[in-house]
Regions:
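A structural signal for small-residue-enriched, beta-sheet-centric alpha/beta enzyme cores
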Residues: 1-101
């Protein structure tokens, strides 16, 4: 669901974008054992939508937080990257229904 959150703020996984996603499993202990039968507990698939939505929203918010936290800085060979003007970012988020007025 991470790519969906990226897509909500305009990302489209362009060639060379370098997107990397890491996921952690909460699988039942011993579930991957190759010996004997195992009993597992799981949430029914139809009840996972809330978790999926929360993941998309968390990724979207994390990206916006990074945009707001960015500061103007100078790098190698005098290359300067500029912080985004917060008022303009807010305007864009409102315009594209990503934020309420």
């Amino acid at each position: 669901r991470v790519p969906m959150g990226i897509g909500k703020v305009g990302g489209y996984a362009s060639n060379g974008s370098g997107d990397i996603f890491i996921a952690f499993s909460t699988a039942n202990e011993g579930v991957f054992s190759r010996k004997g039968n195992r009993t597992i507990e799981m949430v029914p698939n139809d009840q996972m939508s809330g978790l999926f939505l929360a993941t998309v929203q968390a990724v979207e918010e994390a990206i916006v937080n990074v945009l707001v936290a960015a500061e103007t800085m100078e790098g190698v060979n005098g290359n300067t990257v500029y912080a985004l003007p917060h008022d303009r970012l807010k305007q864009l988020l409102v315009k594209y229904n990503r934020m309420k007025k």
